[in-house]
């Protein structure tokens, strides 16, 4: 098979979502990746059987999500109606990811990062571990020693205490307080003193359900210009 290889210059891209609502959110955190090396990427997705033969016989790799995104943002690659599998594999977040262009394979991963093409436009998609795609996107890296442990890296996990405080505050402001206000004007006398626990749990429930549609944007991360460490934007 004659593969068209496209050269990609070093650059920066943002990966991930800052929206953590259940319905509209994506995998987070949103973070910058700095790719310092040149590489070549296949212009089109390659049939998986052909791609596997090429990987075995040539110095090629499955493209990482970061490499794919940098090429896509520079309008260097294309597709038609394929679902292509990238080399990143996640459990549910990007925490602990090295942000230098290498593939991110999370411990105990359960989903494969993919791109779905429809009418020439790609969208982010995730498929379960046991499923496979019919296409891969390949890259050829000019330098085999691009990655090391001193590269910028996201923290191992989110600030759980901050997330918990945010959830409690949302439940208080949008669930519990409105429940008591409603009861004050509409419920029978004595209901608040006798049924306050129901109002609290009802407010908490409303707060939790609101996560389906909305949550405040999460912090994004960038690569520091001088220190080479990940910093909150």
Where do the model's predicted regions map?
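An exposed tryptophan-centered "aromatic clamp" motif
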Residues: 70-106, 191-193
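Alpha-helix capping/hinge segments and adjacent helical runs
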Residues: 93-128, 134-136, 140
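Extended beta-strand/loop cores of jelly-roll/beta-sandwich
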Residues: 1-73, 122-233
């Amino acid at each position: 098979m004659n593969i068209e290889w496209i050269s990609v210059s070093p650059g920066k891209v943002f990966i991930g979502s800052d929206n953590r609502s259940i319905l509209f959110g994506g995998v987070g955190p949103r973070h910058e990746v700095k790719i310092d090396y040149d590489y070549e990427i296949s212009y089109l997705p390659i049939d998986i059987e052909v791609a596997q033969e090429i990987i075995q016989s040539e110095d090629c790799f499955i493209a990482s999500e970061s490499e794919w995104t940098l090429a896509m943002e520079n309008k260097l690659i294309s597709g038609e109606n394929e679902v292509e599998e990238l080399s990143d594999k996640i459990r549910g977040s990007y925490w602990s990811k090295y942000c230098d262009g290498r593939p991110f394979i999370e411990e105990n991963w359960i989903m494969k990062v993919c791109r779905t093409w429809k009418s020439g436009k790609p969208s982010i998609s995730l498929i379960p571990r046991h499923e496979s795609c019919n296409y891969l996107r390949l890259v050829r890296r000019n330098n085999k020693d691009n990655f090391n442990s001193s590269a910028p890296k996201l923290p191992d996990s989110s600030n759980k205490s901050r997330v918990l405080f945010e959830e409690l505050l949302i439940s208080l402001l949008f669930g519990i307080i409105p429940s008591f206000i409603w009861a004050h004007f509409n419920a029978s006398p004595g209901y608040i003193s006798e049924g306050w626990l129901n109002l609290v749990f009802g407010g908490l429930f409303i707060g939790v359900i609101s996560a389906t549609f909305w949550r405040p944007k999460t912090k994004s991360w960038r690569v520091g210009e001088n220190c080479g460490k990940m910093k909150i934007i």
